[in-house]
């Protein structure tokens, strides 16, 4: 009897060790993805054999020249477009269309002008028919997270560009997605506001632990925000280089002047120019 119990305990211990040693599955995975569009001359390949993985709580940026297919890739991940071949998986489940497991923040302001800040944040929650009390609690929480509690009843026309994007981020996060997708969210902002928003986003990411995939033309922005940077080739877009940033998780804007930051920037720029 004692021997049997020992064997059971040993088996449980071995199973626990195997579970600890098992590789962590990716939160988001893109497998062999390609995308082509029909043209008068036949077809045009925009993306070719894209493969990437994001793990839980990672912040990853994609950089590449205009027209390389970055936005097309993000739209496919969001479920707003279909790939010609390959697949996208979130938590191991195939993406077949838009879903609450992915939040999206666009470059251009996408707030509903007839809704207040609170109502904009609540929009997705109402579509999901979330109970009113839970909606109120979540709205209040994310208003506080993005520092806009005092603007809850304001309309988009009363907000600055940076504040509008904070609301857009809060609206996306309120649905508590597995992955937050960002398509050049600060591209329309002036340089000073852009840097302020970069610091804000980094602090927000540290607070919420959300997994982020962001595309940007700004190499410094990509390095400052992310743990890894993917460099895409010109059309057809392929993954040219993956750079591990290797900077401390807690960062400030002065870090952009550090030798470590400059070295990563050199690698990324060299790859973009090749």
Question: What kind of feature is each model-predicted range?
Answer:
Residues 154-157, 175:
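Conserved signature/switch motifs of ABC ATPase nucleotide-binding domains
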Residues 86-98:
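Conserved ABC transporter NBD signature motif
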Residues 122, 126, 133-150, 203:
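Conserved ABC ATPase "signature" region
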Residues 180-183:
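Catalytic Walker B motif of ABC-type/P-loop ATPase nucleotide-binding domains
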């Amino acid at each position: 009897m004692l021997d049997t119990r020992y064997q059971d305990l040993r088996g449980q211990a071995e199973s626990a060790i195997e579970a600890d040693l098992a590789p962590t599955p990716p939160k988001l995975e893109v497998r062999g993805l390609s995308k082509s569009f029909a043209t008068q001359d036949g077809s045009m390949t925009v993306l070719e054999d894209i493969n990437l993985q994001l793990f839980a709580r990672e912040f990853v940026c994609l950089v590449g020249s205009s027209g390389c297919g970055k936005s097309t890739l993000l739209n496919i991940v969001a479920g707003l477009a279909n790939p010609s071949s390959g697949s996208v998986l979130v938590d191991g489940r195939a993406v077949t269309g838009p879903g609450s497991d992915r939040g999206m923040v666009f470059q251009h302001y996408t707030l509903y002008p007839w809704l207040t800040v609170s109502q904009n944040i609540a929009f997705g929650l109402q579509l999901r028919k979330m109970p009113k009390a839970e909606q109120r609690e979540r709205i209040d929480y994310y208003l506080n997270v993005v520092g806009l509690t005092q603007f809850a009843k304001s309309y988009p026309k009363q907000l600055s560009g940076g504040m509008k994007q904070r609301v857009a981020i809060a609206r996306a996060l309120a649905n508590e997605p597995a992955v937050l997708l960002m398509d050049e969210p600060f591209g329309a902002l002036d340089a000073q506001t852009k840097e302020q928003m970069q610091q804000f986003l980094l602090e927000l990411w540290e607070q919420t632990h959300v997994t982020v995939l962001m595309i940007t033309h700004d190499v410094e922005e990509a390095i400052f925000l992310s743990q890894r940077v993917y460099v895409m080739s010109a059309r057809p877009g392929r993954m040219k280089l993956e750079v591990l940033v290797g900077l401390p998780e807690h960062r400030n804007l002065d870090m952009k002047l550090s030798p470590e930051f400059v070295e990563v920037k050199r690698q990324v720029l060299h790859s973009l120019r090749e």
